[in-house]
């Protein structure tokens, strides 16, 4: 720390010169005072300014001091400005520079100090720039992640990575995984909507739906999967195409009756003969006919309470195991042509062969029920099944019995929890109660061999038929 140094030269500005003279004159007199007191000496100062004005200082009396001066004849020290400058140079001090006593204390700005301060400023700027580079902004995109739940249940979920992403982006699932998914599309169906006979009700507004955390169109909507809860792993094998937007595309897919290749434990009430016959009809059906009807799944659960946790499926999870598909139920699908202006591609052969076996009353009742329950289900995307590997058994020729063809069985009463999709269609217009349906269960006749064989055929060792009564849960 030191005073601000000024160069000892004549001050050109008169005002500044006057101020400097006043300050330094007082300073000089102050120093003389200190010297006289400290060292017990006599001091006399005689000063004339630039205007020849006299200023004097004497420690005791000026005249007394001047008298001594005139009478003193011994050699003494006498200095001038040049002598002072020379003495300062010898001591290593710059005679041209002198500290300003009137200036305030301040830091000396030498070239070395300025370089030091400049280097410090550069280091601070570098640290600030590094901190800005390290602060990476959050990403503004979504990365859909397709996660299969297990090896058998490949449901597609989309997980947005960033919370600041665009909510309008649609998750793009992998095509192969999407073909293995159980749902042909996402339906906007609230969980409170009732299940109308296992048919998907609601509107399919878009093929993929809005992006959500669970991969569905709306977190509050049902996934609307046409999956029987008991045969969830079996229905995976029936691949479905990627979802399409029926509102923007006039081409409509074909109707397929989904029959998963289940064992006797999972489908105890459907015979292997029926599986073979349905497999042949599905493979031989024409795929060019336009359909807009929901998929009818004949898969049944093994346990009433077994299902997809938390989400209501298209088929109610309270189905019992006593469920069989009768030929009248399959033939009742022909009512789609008249009631809803639809075509059955996979049941066409059954209509041509066995339509004459159905009475007009049953067809009219099924047609009225179909028009009632399928009025809101005309815009649904439908999966088309591929060829299914089903164990084949010899088919027995159908018998000509017309005892009670109009009364097809309802294996569960109206108050029971287990109902099949086709049973729900049939029971909406049926006037028979549970006791009437149970009375005619043993007398039912199927045109395509869906009924139980007669007692003489049942005991025949050459014909292998699975009994419909096996595995029924009472």
UniProtKB/Swiss-Prot annotation:
Residues 91-118, 375-474 are annotated as: Disordered. GO terms for biological process: AMPA selective glutamate receptor signaling pathway; apoptotic process; axon guidance; B cell homeostasis; B cell proliferation; B cell receptor signaling pathway; blood vessel development; blood vessel remodeling. The modification N6-acetyllysine is found at residues 4, 116, 119, 234, 239, 252, 264. Residues 434-444 have a biased composition (Basic and acidic residues). The keyword Phosphoprotein applies. Changing residue 4 to R: Reduced acetylation by 30%. Some loss of DNA binding and transactivation activity. Residues 420-433 have a biased composition (Low complexity). Transcription activator which binds specifically to the MEF2 element present in the regulatory regions of many muscle-specific genes. Controls cardiac morphogenesis and myogenesis, and is also involved in vascular development. Enhances transcriptional activation mediated by SOX18. May also be involved in neurogenesis and in the development of cortical architecture. Isoforms that lack the repressor domain are more active than isoform 1. This is Myocyte-specific enhancer factor 2C. It comes from Mus musculus. The lineage of its organism: Eukaryota, Metazoa, Chordata, Craniata, Vertebrata.
């Amino acid at each position: 720390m030191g005073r601000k140094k000024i160069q000892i030269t004549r001050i050109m500005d008169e005002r500044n010169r006057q101020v400097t003279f006043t300050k330094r004159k007082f300073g000089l007199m102050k120093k003389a005072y200190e010297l006289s007191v400290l060292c017990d000496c006599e001091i006399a100062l005689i000063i004339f300014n630039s205007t020849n004005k006299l200023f004097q200082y004497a420690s005791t009396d000026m005249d007394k001091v001047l008298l001594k001066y005139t009478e003193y004849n011994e050699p003494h020290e006498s200095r001038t400005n040049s002598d002072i400058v020379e003495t300062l140079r010898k001591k290593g001090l710059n005679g041209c520079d002198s500290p300003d006593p009137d200036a305030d204390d301040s830091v000396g700005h030498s070239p070395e100090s300025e370089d030091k301060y400049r280097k410090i400023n550069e280091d601070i700027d570098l640290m600030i720039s590094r901190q800005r580079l390290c602060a990476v902004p959050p990403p503004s995109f979504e990365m859909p992640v397709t996660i299969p739940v297990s090896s058998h249940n490949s449901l597609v979920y989309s997980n947005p990575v960033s919370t600041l992403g665009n909510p309008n982006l649609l998750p793009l699932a992998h095509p192969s995984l999407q073909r293995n998914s159980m749902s042909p599309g996402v339906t906007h169906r609230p969980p409170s909507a009732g299940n109308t006979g296992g048919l998907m009700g609601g509107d399919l507004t878009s093929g993929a739906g809005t992006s959500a955390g669970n991969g569905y169109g709306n977190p509050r909507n049902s996934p609307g999967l046409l999956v029987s809860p008991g045969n969830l792993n079996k229905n995976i094998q029936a691949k479905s195409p990627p979802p399409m937007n029926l509102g923007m595309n006039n081409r409509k897919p074909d109707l397929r009756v989904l029959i998963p290749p289940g064992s006797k434990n999972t489908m105890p009430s459907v015979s292997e003969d029926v599986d073979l016959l349905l497999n042949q009809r599905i493979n031989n059906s024409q795929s060019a006919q336009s359909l807009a009807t929901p998929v009818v799944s004949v898969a049944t659960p093994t346990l009433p309470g077994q299902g997809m946790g938390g989400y209501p499926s298209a088929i109610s999870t309270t189905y019992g195991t006593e469920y069989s598909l009768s030929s009248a139920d399959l033939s009742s699908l022909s009512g789609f042509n008249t009631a809803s202006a639809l075509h059955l591609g996979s049941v066409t052969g059954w209509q041509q062969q066995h339509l004459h076996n159905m009475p007009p009353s049953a067809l009219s009742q099924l047609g009225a029920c179909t028009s009632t329950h399928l009025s809101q289900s005309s815009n649904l995307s439908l999966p088309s099944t591929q060829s299914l590997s089903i164990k084949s058994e010899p088919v027995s020729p159908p018998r000509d019995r017309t005892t009670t063809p109009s009364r097809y069985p309802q294996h569960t009463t109206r108050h029971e929890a287990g109902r099949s999709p086709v049973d729900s269609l049939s029971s909406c217009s049926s006037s028979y109660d549970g006791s009437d349906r149970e009375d005619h269960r043993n007398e039912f006749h199927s045109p395509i061999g869906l009924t139980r064989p007669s007692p003489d055929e049942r005991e025949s060792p050459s014909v292998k038929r699975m009994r419909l009564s096996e595995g029924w849960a009472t």
